[in-house]
Amino acid sequence: MNQMNPAFVMPDVQSTVDTRQIPIQRVGVKAVRHPLTVRTPDGSAQPTVGTWNLDVHLPAEVKGTHMSRFVALLEENKAPLDSSAFRALLTSMLEKLEAPAGRIEVSFPYFVNKTAPVSGVQSLLDYEVSLMGDSRDGATRLFLKVLVPVTSLCPCSKKISQYGAHNQRSHVTINAELIDDVPVEDLIRIAEEEASCELWGLLKRPDEKFVTERAYENPKFVEDLVRDVAQRLNDDHRIVAYVLEAENFESIHNHSAYAVIESDKRLR
C-alpha cells in the first residue's frame, strides 16, 4: 500500500513553461451536468439541472489550465442564477483560473406554469434555455437563447381547401445578445404570441376547440412567423443583436420548412 511522504511535494505539471509558444483560444471542461436554480420573474427560484461548458484563454507560455477549478467554481456558486449572477460567475472564473478571457455556457430545461385558454386548468410546459457569457479585452457579452414550441397552420392549405388546413408543431429559437436584463418568459411570450397558436401541457375538450380554431384563424407561413417575431425583437431596446430561427415540422412532407433572420442593431 502506497503511503504519502509528508516531506514530498507534488509537482504542478500544468503550471510549467510550454516551449512551443502556441496560445490556446479556448480550453476547459465540456458537458458538465450540475444542479442549479434559476431566478424567476416573481423572485422565486426554480430548481433544474444545467449542462455546463466552461473555458478560458491559455497563454502561449503556460502548459495547462487548472481543470479542477472549473468544477470547483460550480460547487462554490449555488446562488439562484439570473443575468447579474451569471456575469459575476464569469468574473469569478477568470479570477480563479487567472485567465485574461473566458466563456461560460449553460443549458437547462425551464418550466412555465400555463393556464388553459377555456377550462383554466393549469399545467407545466418545458422550454430549452441557454445562457452564454463571453469576457475578453475587458468587455463582457451576454446571450440568452430559448427554444419555444408552437403551432403553425399553412395559409395556402387553408385557402385552397374546402375544409381544414394542414398544421404542425414548430420550433422558434431566439438567440439574443442582451444589453439589459430580459426574463426568459419575455422571449417565450414573443414567440408564442406571433405563432398561429401556442402550446399547453394539458388541455380539455373546450380548450382543444379553442386551439384548433385559433390556429385556423391565424395562419402563417414559416416566413410570416420569423418576420413577425423579428419585428418584436427589433422593437425591444434590451436586445442589441439576435439570431432567430423558425422550423415547421411539416405534417404533409417528410421534411421541415425553415427560415432564419440575423440582425445586429449596432450595424444599422
From Swiss-Prot:
It is an enzyme of class 3 (hydrolase). Pfam families: GCHY-1. One of its GO terms (biological process) is tetrahydrofolate biosynthetic process. One of its GO terms (molecular function) is GTP cyclohydrolase I activity. Keywords: Hydrolase. It catalyses: GTP + H2O = 7,8-dihydroneopterin 3'-triphosphate + formate + H(+). Gene3D superfamilies: Urate Oxidase. Its EC number is 3.5.4.16. Pathway: Cofactor biosynthesis; 7,8-dihydroneopterin triphosphate biosynthesis; 7,8-dihydroneopterin triphosphate from GTP: step 1/1. The record marks 154 as: May be catalytically important. It comes from the Bacteria. Coiled coil: none annotated. Belongs to the GTP cyclohydrolase IV family. Converts GTP to 7,8-dihydroneopterin triphosphate. This is GTP cyclohydrolase FolE2. It comes from Paraburkholderia phymatum (strain DSM 17167 / CIP 108236 / LMG 21445 / STM815). The lineage of its organism: Bacteria, Pseudomonadati, Pseudomonadota, Betaproteobacteria, Burkholderiales. The gene is folE2.
